[in-house]
Amino acid sequence: HICRTMWTSDNPIYEGKHYSISGAAAPPKPSVMPPICIGAYGEQIGLPMVGRLADVWNSSLHGNEDQWIKKRDIVRASAQQAGRDPKSIEISLTIERPLPTTDSESAQFADDLRHLIELDVSHFVLDFGHPKSTEPVLRFIEQVMQPVKTDH
């Protein structure tokens, strides 16, 4: 609430349960509102907060796909309860996985990303660790990233 108030008001005032501001202007006001991205995984507090307030949910695949879908659905239900369009919240997914080193690993990685896109993931944060050469990075671009982008 505070950030959006500061981005839209010449004389921002906000009184919340834990924080308040008065006259904390942050000129110049942005011409395009920056999206609010919240990374959360907790079903009691974090995910409902994402549904109420966030433009983007940064998630990760802890556990299995069914558990992740349950968490996505909590975000969507919370958005609906807050009077928001659940589909308006973009989903970002952090993936920690080594770069593919073979054609078959690349094909599997691309299929995995396509499947996640079908589950409404629109952004990926990819952590490949520390590649020792550019070869696996170039393989990823050519065999995974470009085909997936072409498909969607």
Regions from the language model: what does each represent?
Residues 1-152:
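Active-site-adjacent structural elements that line small-molecule/cofactor binding pockets in enzymes
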